[in-house]
Curated annotation (Swiss-Prot):
InterPro entries the record matches: Actin (IPR004000), ATPase_NBD (IPR043129)
Composition bias type Basic and acidic residues, residue spans: 402-443
Designated name of the protein: Actin-related protein 5
Recorded family membership: Belongs to the actin family. ARP5 subfamily.
GO biological process terms held by the UniProt record: DNA recombination; DNA repair; regulation of DNA-templated transcription
UniProt source species: Dictyostelium discoideum
Pfam families for this protein: Actin
Oligomer status and interactors: Component of the chromatin-remodeling Ino80 complex.
Recorded name of the encoding gene: arpE
SUPFAM superfamilies xref list: Actin-like ATPase domain
Amino acid sequence: MNNIFAYKEIESPIDDQICKDYKTKYANPSIPIIIDNGSYQCRAGFANDISPKLIFRSLVGKVKSTSSPIVGNSLKEGDISRLTIKSPFDSNLLVHPPSQESIFDYIFHKFGIENEIENPVLITEPTSNPTFCRKYMSELLFECYNIKSVVYGIDSLFSFYGQRDQFKDGGKNSLIIGSSFNTTHIYNVQNYNVSHQQTKRINIGGGASTDYLRKLIHLKYPKHKSYFTQNYTNKIKEEHCYVSQGQYIEELKEFENDQLAKEKSVIIQLPYQEIDFEKLEEERQRKIQNRKDLGAKLRELADKKRLEKKTELEDKLASLESILALKTTNVEEFQQTLKSKSYATEKDLIRDIDDLKDKLFGKKKESEQVEDTEEFPLLFIADSELNADQLKEKKKQRQLKSMKDGRLAQKRKRDEEKEKEKEKEEERDRQEEESFLKDPEHYLKDLHSRKSKILEKREARQKQKQKANIVQRNSRLRTIVNPTNHGNYGEKGEEVEDPEEAEESREMAILDKLLNKFDPTSISSAIVSHDDQFPIGEYHTAEDFQVSLGVERIKCPETLFQPKAIIGVDQMGLVEAIISSILSQLPVDTRKLVTENIFLTGGNVNTKHFKDRIHYEIQQIREPYSPLTILKSKDSQLDAWLGARKWCLDNQDNWSNVSISKQDYQEKGYDYIKSHFASNLSLN
């Protein structure tokens, strides 16, 4: 399909090179440094160059507050998410001088300026720039960098100055619409002069529509939030969004028709690794066969291990019995062999033989009577044959014998329980193995299902505990507020182990053991929760990684024309501001002249059909078939800088009359400015 576009990551900018020929080519008081200090992007260069040397985002990044700042194109796309990012601007006003200083440091360093700055500076500022913002800028330029002179001007007016010759009368009477990232301004020019008192500002720019588009995508596709960063959303807005050319509501209704909506929509295909289902089925069958082979191999290994163990025990038993047989033929050799085998007495040898027979045949040899006879000999002698001391000793041995019998009884009981548990476990393992061999796929699916149910129960119990903790915390807060009720404040109940929890833990351990045995590729529940495990047999397709932009394509740019209706910002729309705030204040003849020449500048006017929409709206308020010229800046990224360059070249001989020198700054204060075509209104 033609309306499917692949997701492309934003490439990081190339590092700017340091200028090597500043001393020979640019270090001249007659060559101004031009800085278009935009709130979104900064452009800087020399007036004798045809284009700026530096173009970068107006952002400053830091790892820590004490670390060196990363500025300009040294700030890569991947750094934005891990650094603390600051902008010198709030909206389009300078509010953070340290960040602006870092930007100036970057500019002058890349220009190759090592010591004194010999060039004058032209720098753009926002319309109706507050005095305290200009104060920050003047202090930096004159006191920090020792600039000789500076000119302040408005970027949109410089842009108009650079292209006004394209109008038939040189733009004598014109309407300028400057829509940037953060704000939009409307100026009207009468008799080659800007009427600053009638200039209007709207706090909506391209950034507002980008934010709105990003929120819509995040709401519509929450699983794909990470792809749509601010920069990437701005990129797709510039590539795929467009302004309604005429009646917005009528175009909006077109999306009610499924066929038209499909034709007008675009799809962003996010990164996705395509699945070959034929290979997937082959892989599934291979895994099933591998599991069967694994089961057979496990049985074979277990049988082999049991046989080896049995053979080893039989050989050891035969060796010990041969030693015991020496007692009947050669007592002396028997005693020597006992010592060489580290047996202290014949009793130790017999005990080992009995233990081996128990392991091999499961028959217990009763040797306790012999042990008791040797350990408690007085118990087997009549009282009449014992003296008083021996009777006391016999009484003591009887007590010891009773205690020993009790311990042996407990041990036998524990051994029996262990034996039963072991038999039960062996029987369970045997049944599980039979189930696995019968149908490996169904068996593993059942194991995963049982495991998921336990994890769901755990999650539900955890939520209940959190709610209970909130209730307890609120209760303690009420106790603090009410000091009369302080009987058990601060006390914590003993944590009692939940039998159900303990049983679930045992069941989970068994399931993990079985999964590790029959499905080694399975991930332990201790590492990954059930939310992260996809159900067996469920696969994602390319459509699951597609983001469709339909009505959003015209809805987001419309925020400039209907900010209150769409995003709830209590501002006039662009056309409403033009009509009610500017044209209604002008005489009919002047209104006709001003609206005959319209100049569009700023990055936001590059939105598709923006010029057509302005033509449609302005034509509604003009006489039918009256001439109307709408001129859009050739390159909105460089237009203000190029216009400022043209203005500098035109005013080279008049520089002292339009610039503020350091002496002016020191004598007349930071709020002193000189008027020229592109300057703010001077109240001096």
